[in-house]
A protein has these predicted regions:
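Sec-dependent N-terminal signal peptides of Gram-positive bacterial secreted proteins and lipoproteins
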Residues: 7-30
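Active-site histidine-acidic residue metal-binding/catalytic motifs
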Residues: 31-103, 107-109, 122, 126-129, ...
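Active-site-adjacent mobile loop/cap segments within catalytic or ligand-binding domains
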Residues: 43, 114-122, 171-281
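Solvent-exposed loop/turn segments at secondary-structure junctions
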Residues: 48-51, 90-95, 117-123, 137-141, ...
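Stable alpha-helical elements in mature extracytoplasmic
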Residues: 62-65, 69, 73, 97-100, ...
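Sec-exported extracytoplasmic/periplasmic mature domains
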Residues: 71-82, 105-109, 117, 146, ...
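Active-site-adjacent substrate-binding region
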Residues: 147-186
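Ser/Thr/Gly/Pro-rich low-complexity, disordered linker/stalk segments of secreted
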Residues: 255-348
Length: 348
């Protein structure tokens, strides 16, 4: 009898200790979603809003396009079982970059998807097509792998619509801001915030507002914006292996898949590092190959002319919204635009 009592006592001690440890030590983002919550919680972030119009084309403002895509994406994702979807904004008003990430924290989000559209600029050598921003390799590598693999699935679905796939974009801090391990932090605040808060976060640039072909084919009507959103949803569903309410399971996620990586180091496209990374199942390690120190992408004009030796007009991922300096200034003054390269803000 004494032996039985002692065994029960130690069993209770072990059980209490296990429960305590699970409460104290946080799980990874994906483990947290599958182990302690029923639903996959996704926060969709429509870029810009309020006085922050983003890029413009005549009377068309990026902030409006972003919100419509986000609303359609929410609608598409809610067709899947076990998914809860929220928006950081549901109208035309400004939300600070810090508040966007904090909203995801408050929602205990498993994923944050920031919705944007692009404009020609000077940090990447292309002026049309889609790209997805994600965390850099190195610091919190597991999180970076998760974001980049999700990005592959989203890009695959967008390119299936005919949009040119410009790959995954990574960018170094230009203010020498560093993570705890001493590595340069991510440049874009929405990506950096996700890293610091352990929330997988990607930013999708769907198409170029100032490119005639991109705009006409993908952004010129609500119906076309809905198609973009449904492609985003399909990519997310593939990665997380979601099932619709009527029992239809998403296609298997991409595996052994090679994707282009554009790594911006200083905002000058001539210094960009281009590589191709193969993404394997989780049991294998990702590999990078064919690295170069020059962004060799060309614009459509260059492809047509083939006679000029000048550098290509380069594209700025509109997400100047997400830069570290702009994040600070947007919080200091509500009159400061999140995207300093965009055209003058006009009322809708």
């Amino acid at each position: 009898m004494k032996t039985i009592i002692k065994t029960n006592y130690f069993s209770r001690v072990f059980l209490y200790g296990l429960i305590f440890s699970l409460c104290i030590f946080p799980l990874s983002a994906k483990a947290r979603q599958t182990s302690s919550k029923k639903d996959l919680c996704i926060v969709i972030d429509p870029g810009h809003g309020g006085i922050q119009s983003g890029t413009q084309r005549g009377t068309v403002e990026e902030k409006t396009l972003n919100l419509k895509i986000a609303q359609y994406l929410k609608e598409a994702l809610e067709k899947y079982k076990g998914v809860t979807v929220s928006l950081t904004r549901d109208g035309d008003y400004d939300v600070s970059l810090t508040d966007r990430t904090q909203y995801s924290v408050d929602k205990n989000a498993d994923l944050m998807v920031s919705i944007h559209n692009n404009a020609t600029g000077d940090c990447a050598a292309y002026d049309s097509g889609c790209t997805v921003l994600a965390a850099k390799d190195g610091y919190k590598q597991e999180l970076a792998d998760e974001e980049q693999k999700l990005a592959c699935n989203i890009l695959n679905e967008l390119s299936a619509l005919g949009i040119e796939n410009q790959g995954i974009l990574l960018r170094d801090s230009e203010a020498n801001e560093k993570y705890e391990n001493g590595e340069l932090a991510d440049y874009y605040a929405i990506i950096r915030g996700g890293v610091l808060k352990d929330i997988p976060t990607v930013l999708v640039e769907h198409a170029f507002v100032d490119d005639d072909s991109d705009f006409e084919n993908y952004l010129s009507s609500d119906a076309k914006l809905k198609v973009l959103a449904e492609a985003d949803a399909k990519g997310i569903a593939r990665y997380y292996q979601l099932t619709t309410e009527d029992g239809k399971k998403a296609e298997s996620p991409l595996e052994n898949y090679k994707e282009k990586i554009v790594h911006i180091v200083d905002g000058n496209s001539k210094h960009n590092k281009i590589s191709y990374k193969t993404y394997y199942p989780s049991s294998k390690k990702e590999t990078e190959e064919n690295s170069s120190n020059t962004d060799t992408a060309t614009t459509k004009a260059e492809k047509q002319e083939q006679t000029t030796e000048k550098s290509a007009p380069e594209a700025k991922t509109d997400v100047g919204l997400e830069s570290e300096s702009q994040e600070k200034s947007s919080e200091e003054s509500s009159n400061t635009s999140e995207n300093t390269s965009s055209k003058s803000v006009t009322k809708p």
